């Protein structure tokens, strides 16, 4: 649903750019090429690029109207002459939001072998 001239045209990449190990362009590189370059940096320099780390994630906790923080909230209810039972509260809760990690963690979908164990050669 747009005009024919509203689409942006991409320019072909320049062939004269030198290929370096440490720098990766995200805009022009395909994801598999980018991962391969990062893996090469990991092998040659022994460092872990920032691309493989997660600094914050969505929290699974909720905040109720009193400001208490928990994964689930329950309320004890009792009707006329019945047993007491716990009912899960679903109303008036808001998600905690994103949580920043004190120590960055590895992404779960890294397609690179970070540590490889080799069997000792018997002579």
UniProtKB/Swiss-Prot annotation:
Residues 1-28 are annotated as: Disordered. Residues 7-20 have a biased composition (Basic and acidic residues). GO terms for cellular component: mitochondrion. It comes from the Eukaryota. Pfam families: TUSC2. One of its GO terms (biological process) is regulation of mitochondrial membrane potential. Belongs to the TUSC2 family. This is Uncharacterized protein C09E9.1. It comes from Caenorhabditis elegans.
């Amino acid at each position: 649903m747009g005009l024919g001239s509203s689409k942006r045209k991409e320019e072909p990449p320049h062939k004269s750019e030198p290929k370096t190990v440490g720098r990766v362009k995200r805009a022009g590189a395909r994801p598999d090429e980018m991962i391969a370059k990062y893996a090469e940096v990991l092998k040659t320099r022994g460092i872990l690029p920032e691309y493989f780390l997660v600094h914050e994630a969505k929290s699974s906790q909720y905040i109720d109207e009193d400001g208490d923080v928990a994964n689930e909230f329950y309320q004890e209810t009792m009707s006329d002459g019945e047993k007491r039972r716990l009912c899960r509260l679903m109303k008036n809760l808001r998600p905690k939001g994103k949580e920043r990690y004190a120590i960055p963690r590895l992404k779960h979908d890294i397609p690179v072998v970070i540590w490889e164990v080799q069997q000792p050669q018997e002579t």
